[in-house]
Structure formats: C-alpha cells, structure tokens
Regions:
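Surface-exposed amphipathic alpha-helices with a cationic face
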Residues: 92-105
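Short coil-to-beta-strand
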Residues: 32-33, 63, 71
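Core AdoMet radical
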Residues: 38-54, 67-87, 105-120, 129, ...
Length: 172
C-alpha cells in the first residue's frame, strides 16, 4: 500500500504533555476547508512524499525506539490534512495497530480529525480508530482560537475542538 505524507517530525506542540512524533498525512476531504488552516500544503492528496506503508512503519518504529531511549512514554500523533480521509484511513489503522502492538503502553496514539464523534459514528469509521488512545475532534475554528492572556496557543487550538481520552475502543 502506498501512503502520502507531508512531513514527520518530533514535536512538543501536538500533544499537551508528551513528546510527540507527528505524522502529517497528505490530503484533506473537508469541504469547505477550515478558515485560516495552518496546513494548507496538506490539502491535496497524492502529493509530497510517497511511502510504501511497511517502509513508513519501519521509519516510525526507528523514531519511537530512539525517543524511548530518553522518554518513558511518547505520543504518536496523526494529523494532516485528514488522517480519516478515505485515501488515508487504511494506512492510519495499520500504522496505529502495528505500533500499539509493538510498543503497547509506551506510546499514546493520538488522532486529530475535523470530524466530530457523531460524524465518525455516522460514517462508520469506528474501526479505523480502534487503536487510538486519544482523539482531538472537530474542525479548527480560528474565531474560537484557544489562547491564554499572553496570546500563547493552548490545547486544543480552538475551543470547539473536543479532546477525548479513552482506554477501550468505541463500540458501535
């Protein structure tokens, strides 16, 4: 399977407490797009860096192993674009499954999506998030930007987004 990724990097911005390995998937299926989206370069599918899925998983395993030499636990953060877009969701499922099986409680799989929990259920996408530990759901809304009195962006980035932590899979 081929997967298109815009970028992969270590980040302290994409998770509220843990060092994250952020995977920005290419392509966003939201219409209209989020006003003032800071990832416009991820909108178009099938651009940027093309990976064989197994090669991408190995790259991520190597990065996780390296990070776990210094940290007890890290986040693997799935962003975009849109990780649950039809052309990304199978890869997101396979990556999250393999990483969770290998690293178990040493990683926290965290997925960002413009979709709400209701939309995930309505679109029958629950299976794709089976190995996620946390979700940040809802479109970015710049008019509801979540900042402190000094202007620092808080988590999540807009007040309409929901941060959900759970220990077991969502049931249908």
């Amino acid at each position: 399977m081929t997967v298109y990724v815009n970028r992969i990097f270590f980040s302290t911005n994409d998770h509220p407490k843990l060092l994250g390995i952020s995977i920005y998937f290419q392509g966003c299926d939201r219409s209209p797009k989020c006003l003032l989206c800071h990832n416009k370069e991820t909108w178009e599918p099938y651009r940027r860096f093309k990976y064989d899925l197994e090669d991408l998983i190995q790259i991520l395993k190597d990065k996780i192993t390296y990070a776990l030499e210094s940290y007890d636990k890290i986040a693997v953060v799935y962003l975009g674009g849109e990780p649950l877009a039809p052309y990304n969701r199978d890869a997101v499922f396979q990556i999250s499954k393999e990483l969770k099986e290998e690293f178990s409680e040493k990683i926290v799989n965290t997925l960002y999506s413009w979709r709400t929990l209701e939309e995930i259920e309505k679109q029958n996408l629950e299976n794709y998030i089976e190995y996620m530990d946390e979700l940040v759901l809802g479109p970015y809304d710049h008019t509801q930007r979540n900042v402190d009195e000094k202007g620092n962006v808080l988590f999540p980035a807009s007040k309409n987004q929901k941060y959900i932590k759970f220990n077991k899979v969502l049931s249908k």
